[in-house]
Amino acid sequence: MERYDILRDLGSGNFGVAKLVREKANGEFYAVKYIERGLKIDEHVQREIINHRDLKHPNIIRFKEVFVTPTHLAIVMEYAAGGELFERICNAGRFSEDEGRYYFKQLISGVSYCHAMQICHRDLKLENTLLDGSPSSHLKICDFGYSKSSVLHSQPKSTVGTPAYVAPEVLSRKEYNGKIADVWSCGVTLYVMLVGAYPFEDPEDPRNIRNTIQRILSVHYTIPDYVRISSECKHLLSRIFVADPDKRITVPEIEKHPWFLKGPLVVPPEEEKCDNGVEEEEEEEEKCRQSVEEIVKIIEEARKGVNGTDNNGGLGLIDGSIDLDDIDDADIYDDVDDDEERNGDFVCAL
């Protein structure tokens, strides 16, 4: 940490804590995610770092480097000063159709890039979309802990993600197309932006995970009468929320949908800067970038733990995301204190 000044905490979760830091050499701000050394440095952590390393897109949080401290593995990445999109919806209640489309276009742009890089995210949700804090409020996808690369890994079949956002086929415990499952999660994100509630929660018992899963499997959702959205938007949602993944709309098809094509073009932040030094800066960054071999070596060092001990706190809820294969048909919320935030339920009044 000799190169960084720690400024303040950004948040915490089961993974550990995130801090805002400033690089001493150039004054640049970064976010650093600290994960305790030991068994918490699992396959999800390694996958997150390796997959994230190769992604360079204006709508994806940029990875910088990883290193170890005596007690933690530290992942350094771009700092998004605008916070979570989740928080903005909590404050607004819900977005207008134009505002929802503005963010949805950016989400799809980032997801399309990931898919072109043969990476499916598998845990797309509002809490994993950040805002850069600029006047234009650009969206940034983060947290690749459950992502899977078809280049490095087989077709996904594990049941991972956040319950409210999970596609029906993900619950089947069979192999599925992670890219098409991502489309479903994007649809849930769009619905929440426009409605201010989750599409498949039981309004009578929103914390009942079994009811949510049943409603997902039966594609049971409605758009409340008080929400005014266009027929084109409703049509897009109906093409996303399709139980059969083979019949679900794809990302390229979404990009051609009439509703998606409406509204102004979203200018990427790199184009807004018009900085002649950007290319040189990126070339220099590429020269200094850690290799996969270096990263794996650092991760192996972090797995050793502190003084030969492991720091595994158990795996269940990770920032609201779960591996349902680890839970034997149990109500996952039994393991969470009532006062803790539960993804799958808004914790603020909408």
From Swiss-Prot:
GO terms for molecular function: ATP binding; kinase activity; protein serine kinase activity; protein serine/threonine kinase activity. Expressed in seedlings. Keywords: ATP-binding, Coiled coil, Kinase, Nucleotide-binding, Serine/threonine-protein kinase, Transferase. SMART domains: S_TKc. Residues 4-260 form the Protein kinase domain. It catalyses: L-seryl-[protein] + ATP = O-phospho-L-seryl-[protein] + ADP + H(+); L-threonyl-[protein] + ATP = O-phospho-L-threonyl-[protein] + ADP + H(+). ATP binds at residues 10-18, 33. It is an enzyme of class 2 (transferase). Induction: By abscisic acid (ABA), salt, and osmotic stress (at protein level). Signal peptide: none annotated. Its EC number is 2.7.11.1. Residues 270-303 form a coiled coil. It holds the Pfam family Pkinase. The active site is at residue 123. GO terms for cellular component: cytoplasm; nucleus. GO terms for biological process: response to osmotic stress; response to salt stress. Belongs to the protein kinase superfamily. Ser/Thr protein kinase family. This is Serine/threonine-protein kinase SRK2F.
